[in-house]
Regions:
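Helix N-cap motif at beta-to-alpha junctions
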Residues: 59-64, 103-107, 166
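A contiguous pocket-lining binding segment that forms or flanks enzyme active sites
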Residues: 101-136
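Ordered, amphipathic secondary-structure segments that act as subunit-interaction surfaces
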Residues: 50-99
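Flexible helix-coil linker/hinge segments at domain or subdomain boundaries
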Residues: 24-27, 66
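Short, charge-patterned binding micro-sites
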Residues: 26-58
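Short amphipathic alpha-helices in soluble, non-transmembrane regions
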Residues: 64-75, 109-121, 176-177
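Core RNA-modification/binding signature centered on pseudouridine synthases
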Residues: 4, 122-241
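N-terminal ordered "arm"
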Residues: 1-25
Length: 241
């Protein structure tokens, strides 16, 4: 499966596996430190093997079974062809978790936030400014679905976004939040208050928020979500309202 990798490519693959496994590997001294790992004789390209060895020096003891287990868990059982499309072209479904922290004395309700998002969806998009350019966030194209639930406190809501991304555009959660905030004030986005892309937004009805991208997945020809690693399925559940 990997016989067409050159020796240096094999070395780099093993080094990445060790890092993913979280093993406490040692590094060499000198001007250009690197992982202290030694390999047996190199194989010619095109020659496969079922018995390869390497020495890995570590800074602390790790039991043999644990080390092998962590290495195995960090090793993908697949080879990705170099002609495979770039991840930016493959990963077209992205999920976000947004924690909304509201004013404890006068919090907006989940129903109000939901109504604001639904109003924006009905308008199909959000016009906003980014620097000197005017842009539009196409919600028909980028917002697949969402789920809004109560958080741990009355002034905390959790917004889950299921989004689509490609060369035509991708979701910008901060633009969606900024436009929803304007609606929650009883104003019209882009008319009574401009929507400007400035990274983290300074909102009125939302004291603060935290955005976390929680998953990235591919879509197959039938629209099913799959992992970019062909032999694995992706634990990504789309969120719908």
């Amino acid at each position: 499966r990997l016989k067409y990798l050159g020796h240096l490519e094999v070395i780099h693959t093993i080094e990445r596996i060790v890092r993913r496994a979280g093993l406490p590997y040692a590094v060499t001294q000198g001007f250009s430190p690197h992982m202290r790992v030694g390999f047996s004789s190199a194989l010619p390209v095109g020659t496969s093997s079922t018995c390869e060895w390497y020495d890995l020096f570590m800074t602390e003891f790790v039991a043999l079974d644990e080390a092998f287990g962590r290495l195995a868990a960090a090793s993908q059982a697949a080879y990705i062809d170099v002609r495979t499309p770039a991840l930016t072209a493959q990963l077209t479904r992205l999920s976000y978790r947004i924690d909304l922290h509201l004013d404890a004395e006068a919090p907006v309700s989940a129903d109000e936030v939901r109504a604001a998002i639904d109003t924006l969806r009905a308008g199909h998009g959000i016009d906003y400014a980014r620097g000197k350019k005017s842009k539009r966030l196409d919600l028909d194209h980028t917002l697949v679905g969402y789920e809004l639930t109560a958080g741990e406190r009355p002034d905390h809501l959790v917004l889950m976004l299921d989004t689509h991304a490609d060369n035509e555009g991708s979701m910008r959660p901060e633009i969606l939040l900024s436009a929803a905030d304007v609606l929650l004030q009883g104003l019209t986005p882009g008319v009574d208050a401009p929507i400007v892309s400035t990274g983290m937004q300074d909102l009125v009805t939302i004291c603060s928020y935290d955005v976390e991208r929680q998953n990235q997945a591919c879509e197959d020809d039938e629209g099913r979500l799959v992992s970019p690693i062909p032999v694995r399925t992706c634990g990504f559940a789309p969120h719908t309202r």
